[in-house]
From Swiss-Prot:
It comes from Escherichia coli (strain K12). This is Putative uncharacterized protein YafF. The lineage of its organism: Bacteria, Pseudomonadati, Pseudomonadota, Gammaproteobacteria, Enterobacterales. It comes from the Bacteria. InterPro entries: Transposase_11-like.
Length: 62
């Protein structure tokens, strides 16, 4: 993921979005049920709501 490609420039939005993205990457990196790379985990979370719910439940955010 290249942060320079994002077009978020209004106020503190770029900094906030960067922090949210960092938290999401950390959650997916620490998830151990689905053995895959970060990109595959991101794609699976985007397409499978059950997997997304299990990742969020496992991180304590749901």
């Amino acid at each position: 993921m290249n942060e320079d490609d994002y077009k978020i420039r209004r106020g503190n939005a770029a900094e906030l979005f960067s922090g949210i993205r960092h938290i999401a990457i950390n959650i997916l990196t620490n998830e151990k049920v689905f053995k895959a790379g970060l990109r595959r985990k991101m794609r699976k979370a985007a397409m499978d709501r059950n997997y997304l719910a299990s990742v969020l439940a496992g991180s304590g955010l749901s």
